[in-house]
């Protein structure tokens, strides 16, 4: 019985010592400067985003098609938070991440959203940023772009109580309803959206 206990103790100790090697990363990252990441796209484009209204979430994939794990030294938005883009990398939100491990022949999602600040103009404005990746001192990037458009916003059941014109200078976004009071006229210019 004593011999069985000692044998089980030795086996348990050996198994526990082997567990850290099972995560596949354990600081054995390749430092090969020829290894690169691959991406599912080189440009992540958003359709026109109305100012102050957030976008839908878009995504792209990071691939490590190499035969060894890599440590991504940094993943960051080139402009920080200045352009309104936000990202989630490997389940973490932020504009900058350091030392993100990726196994050999594995992949990882990057989720991106954008909210465009009003610019006071009537025409769509191109907003660009990049997600920058550094691996073994080599920088790679994925371009982010969206068109921001200021809108005339009517929110929460607005009632028009005097004669009005909806102009064609910028789009209208109506949440809930837009009611025209009795006896009031509403003219809509040609081309108004």
Regions found by a protein language model. Give the residues of each.
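Coil residues (strongly favoring Ser/Thr
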Residues: 43, 48, 74, 107, ...
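Surface-exposed binding patches on compact interaction domains or structured appendages
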Residues: 23-45, 65-113, 118
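Buried hydrophobic-core signal for structured, non-transmembrane domains
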Residues: 57-64, 112, 127-134
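C-terminal motif of bacterial Sec signal peptides marking the signal peptidase cleavage site
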Residues: 18-21
